[in-house]
A protein has these predicted regions:
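Hydrophobic/aromatic-lined pockets within catalytic cores
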Residues: 54-62, 154-157, 188-191
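Short glycine/proline-enriched coil/turn segments at helix->beta-strand junctions
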Residues: 63, 118, 145-148, 189-193
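Flexible, glycine- and charge-enriched loops at secondary-structure boundaries
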Residues: 43, 172-176, 217-220
């Protein structure tokens, strides 16, 4: 691999990260290269807990109740991150009946999507090199079986307030286009159809080639072209700068993007790159 990309701590393209604004992706890679720890908000923690429980049941054959006991360990250790303070100070991570409901819906939906599978496999590393792009793509699928890959997305609102209480995450009427583009890569590597499963504490929705054009073969082809175009463009941009700081200064940041929700010290460091922390 050329030092052109190593100097940015860029070793591969991710089907999800390549859809982020480049300046956010670069800064996160800079922090990771320094060994900085990342803080994740409660939705990420909840999503991981639901996936862990579903995987324990579907992949490892564990009893649901036993899987729930293991799944709550990550929730118990979660601490509210800085952007969940103030109005969001009363963090209410779902446990007990709520986590049981969400994970139960996940298990039901994934089982339905993979009804033809004799065996369900869990997270799998997937990589592929494409012509015209120097760096390979690397991603991790959630569930696979019966020649179909399933990506699980958990929709939840983890914050309670005195008036409304904690609200359930809303299920989408159609898949998020970024999610559809992400699974296009998995479908391409595994040469199989793909399904997107959305779960909340109120139910689930399943999207596949039968009810979503983006998850059809032509839809995957178009989304894969977009992924490769984004990767190709990033590599071209990285060839134009000597270091991460200079490259980031060539880009225009939008600090309203959720990707900038991070440790305040890290955010201040990022803003300084564009001189935005000066009085």
């Amino acid at each position: 691999m050329s030092d052109t990309f190593k100097k940015f701590s860029y070793y591969h393209h991710s089907p999800s990260a390549v859809q982020k604004p480049l300046e956010i992706d670069l800064f996160q890679k800079l922090l990771k290269a320094r060994g900085e720890s990342f803080q994740f908000g409660s939705p990420v923690t909840i999503g991981r807990a639901v996936e862990d429980v579903a995987s324990a049941v579907l992949v490892n054959g564990m009893d649901h109740k036993e899987a729930l006991r293991h799944g709550t360990s990550g929730l118990d250790s979660h601490e509210a991150v800085p952007w969940e303070q103030g109005e969001m100070a009363r963090l209410d991570l779902p446990r007990g009946d709520t986590l049981e409901a969400m994970s139960g819906y996940a298990i039901e939906a994934i089982s339905q999507a993979l009804s033809k599978a004799n065996q369900i496999k869990g997270q799998e590393r997937l990589d592929k090199k494409y012509a015209g792009i120097v760096l390979p793509f690397l991603g991790y699928s959630d569930f696979y079986g019966g020649n179909r890959v399933v990506e699980l997305k958990v929709k939840t609102t983890a914050v309670s307030d005195s008036k409304a209480g904690r609200r359930a995450g809303s299920l989408p009427s159609k898949p998020d286009s970024n999610h559809a583009t992400q699974v296009a890569f998995y479908a391409d590597v595994l040469n199989c159809p793909a399904t997107l499963v959305y779960v909340s504490e109120k139910g689930f929705k399943i999207f596949d080639e039968t009810n979503c054009e983006e998850l059809s073969t032509p839809g995957f082809a178009n989304n894969l072209k977009e992924l490769k175009a984004r990767a190709w463009a990033r590599e071209n941009i990285m060839r134009c700068a000597p270091d991460t700081r200079t490259l980031m200064q060539m880009l225009s940041p939008n600090f309203q993007d959720w990707g900038w929700k991070m440790n305040p010290e890290h955010l201040e460091e990022a803003r300084a790159i564009w001189g935005l922390n000066q009085s």
